[in-house]
A protein has these predicted regions:
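Iron-associated oxidoreductase/ferritin-like identity signal
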Residues: 1-164
Length: 164
């Protein structure tokens, strides 16, 4: 059985993962609205991955006979200035999730909850991949600036990242 503090922290992380899913759905819709269909499809798929992260946490809590407490998910932003703005905000959000996961890992280690510490290692690895992915997208968008042809090409590149 997990401690009450651990259960509370994991429930908070579920909420953060669900917020990320909703944020990426909002960003996906913005991309489709502005004819960035590749980026829209990519972010739509990424929203599914974020909800999978929440489900993985829910499963862990269920497997440990702990109480899952789903809370209200904050409304995500839906007003973006550009494709670069979308992906800069995505990258910033992933950095905040990484910080949250790192705090969880630190807490588990200091409280000697080695099972949950081990479980969270998947998230540590996942966040490393996420940050590298989104940093790369931001860098590519910055390379082409606001050039119409370049934006089309970067949209196609982003689409190619689905399921990689």
């Amino acid at each position: 059985m997990l401690s009450k503090e651990v259960v509370a922290l994991l429930n908070e992380q579920i909420n953060k993962e669900m917020y990320a899913a909703n944020l990426y759905l909002s960003m996906s819709s913005w991309c489709y609205e502005h004819s960035f269909d590749g980026a829209g499809a990519f972010l739509f798929e990424h929203a599914r991955e974020e909800s999978d992260h929440a489900r993985k946490l829910i499963t862990y809590l269920n497997e440990t006979d702990s109480k899952v407490e789903l809370k209200e998910v904050k409304k995500p932003d839906n007003d973006f200035k550009s494709l670069l703005d979308v992906f800069e905000k995505t990258f910033e959000h992933e950095q905040s999730i990484t910080a949250s996961i790192n705090n969880l890992v630190d807490f588990m280690l200091s409280s000697k909850d080695y099972s949950t510490f081990n479980f969270l290692q998947w998230y540590v690895s996942e966040q490393h991949e996420e940050e590298a992915l989104f940093r790369g997208i931001v860098d590519k968008i910055k390379l082409i600036s606001d050039n119409g042809n370049g934006l089309y090409m970067v949209d196609q590149y982003i689409k190619s990242l689905i399921n990689k």
